[in-house]
Curated annotation (Swiss-Prot):
UniProt cross-references to Gene3D superfamilies, sorted A to Z: 3.30.1370.30, 3.30.1490.10
Keywords: Ribonucleoprotein, Ribosomal protein, RNA-binding, rRNA-binding
Top-level taxon: Bacteria
Transmembrane feature ranges: none
GO CC entries: ribonucleoprotein complex; ribosome
Role description: One of the primary rRNA binding proteins, it binds directly to 16S rRNA central domain where it helps coordinate assembly of the platform of the 30S subunit.
Lineage start: Bacteria, Pseudomonadati, Pseudomonadota, Betaproteobacteria, Nitrosomonadales
HAMAP family associated with the record: Ribosomal_uS8_B
UniProt-recorded name of the protein: Small ribosomal subunit protein uS8
Family: Belongs to the universal ribosomal protein uS8 family.
Assembly and oligomerization: Part of the 30S ribosomal subunit. Contacts proteins S5 and S12.
Pfam families assigned: Ribosomal_S8
Molecular functions (GO terms): rRNA binding; structural constituent of ribosome
Organism whose genome encodes this protein: Methylobacillus flagellatus (strain ATCC 51484 / DSM 6875 / VKM B-1610 / KT)
């Protein structure tokens, strides 16, 4: 079975795992998924992530984070999708919850948060929003 949107699948796996209070979640790995996981870790939304080979295929394992028994990630949504790509300039990147959340953007300088993209003066594809 081919997967038409692996990023949406990643976000859905995280959302579903947190709704059932799982400690970790695993999924097929890619460079983009690892970059998104690195941004989530830097922003404090997940504890850690690692890549392991399972039957010769890389698997991304994400350790989820909870605070007082509740998931740290309250909202995680895909913005740009294969059927409708969303690109924004550095001043047009949306701000999530007045700066309390982050928008993850894929730029020419790598995957980064909306704040870092504005500081670097680059725009790009708006991958997802996390709050």
């Amino acid at each position: 079975m081919s997967m038409s949107d692996p990023i949406a699948d990643m976000l859905t796996r995280i959302r579903n795992a947190q709704s059932t209070n799982k400690v970790s979640v695993s999924m097929p790995s890619s460079k983009l998924k690892r970059a998104i996981a690195a941004v989530l870790k830097d922003e404090g939304y997940i504890d850690d992530f690692s890549v392991q080979d399972v039957d010769g295929k890389p698997q991304l394992n994400i350790s989820l984070k909870y605070y007082a028994g509740r998931p740290v990630i309250e909202k995680i949504e895909r913005v740009s999708r294969p059927g409708l790509r969303i690109y924004r300039g550095n001043q047009e990147i949306p701000v999530v919850m007045h700066g309390l959340g982050v928008t993850i953007v894929s730029t020419s300088k790598g995957v980064m948060t909306d704040r870092k993209a504005r500081d670097a003066g680059v725009g790009g594809e708006v991958l997802c929003v996390v709050a």
